[in-house]
Amino acid sequence: MATKVTIQDIANELQLSRNTVSKAINNTGVLADATREKILRKAAEMGYKQFAYLPLFQEDAAKTAESSILPSGKREIAMLTTQFLSSSHFSSMMPDRFQSEIDHLHSYMTIHRISPIELKEKKLPSSLNIQHTAGIICFEVFDYDYAQMLCDLDVPLLFVDTPVMEMRPPLKADRLYMENRIEIQNAVAHMVQRGKKRISFAGDKNHCQSFFERYMAYKDAVEHFGLTEGLSTCAMPSGQQNYPVSLYETIRRFKTMPDAFVCANDFVAMDLVKALDELGYSVPDDIWVCGFDDSQEASYFAPHLTSIHIHGQIMGYTAANLLMTRIEEPSLNYRTVYTETNLILRESTGD
């Protein structure tokens, strides 16, 4: 059995710190582009986690093609992403389950990263051969015009999360989301029940549809409880490359700090906790913080982070079902599916 490649193995190979390698793979923190690219290339070369998926099952596919629902000559299920998927619970477990579900179809899954230039010029990744592609699944594809270009390819297509869709024509594709509203509102209710009155939001609400839905769920909840003063201290810097610094500068200007923050995801929450600490505020003693995703980091971050758990296995199973049924029945009406999430209370909200 092959030895599992770890972040420390990659760090040793490149003579870098484990923390630096983790930042590159998880797309957190600030790194020079050249350093990030070097780490990601080495991760793919060494077969780290999802990077080892390229490609699988090609030999068997040719032998058993007749039993597959896939069109003749099209064996590839292409995963497109604007960045390598992190090792957080959701984005590492979902592709694993997705791949296990498509194995019996005698297909193989490939992962293609959309470069910034390809994104800007609305071009497919150079590594993708569309003539051999039976279907496409998209992660972290949040540019609306690029998403529309993919919809025009006439290839079965599934988006896992999408660009913000408010006041825009719908995408002609199936869409899969995690449930973003219910547990955000439960988190706000929990804070209110424990005496928190000034509750704010942190994160770029326009980053993607899920972030937008989380913000709207937060806003609806504080308005429901009549506690709208927290709306004036939401920390929502947008389009910033150096997000932790932008977040710090945003909250540093607040004349009054909130009692609690609901965050767009765990990495925003962790950046926020660090910024608050630099400003002399303790979490949870002074301010409560809730994340979203329930990433692996959430359970060992200090303080342990209250978060909203995404069921990666269920997301992967549902994604496979949506894409395979689209391949089998291309004329189906487009579907939008949400999967359950759950609030996990931990130390950052005094639990």
What are these regions (language model features)?
Residues 1-65:
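N-terminal helix-turn-helix DNA-binding module of bacterial transcription factors
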Residues 2, 48-124:
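Amphipathic helical "hinge" segments at domain boundaries
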Residues 89-105, 183-186, 209-229, 271, ...:
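Short, solvent-exposed amphipathic alpha-helices that sit
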Residues 102-114, 201, 219-242:
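Short beta-strand elements in bilobed, periplasmic/extracellular small-molecule ligand-binding domains
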Residues 139-183, 267, 293-305:
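Flexible loop/hinge segments that line or gate small-molecule binding clefts
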Residues 174-202, 241-249, 269, 310-328:
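Hydrophobic alpha-helical segments within soluble ligand-binding/sensing domains
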Residues 185-227, 335-350:
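An alpha-beta-alpha
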Residues 248-351:
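Flexible loop/turn connectors
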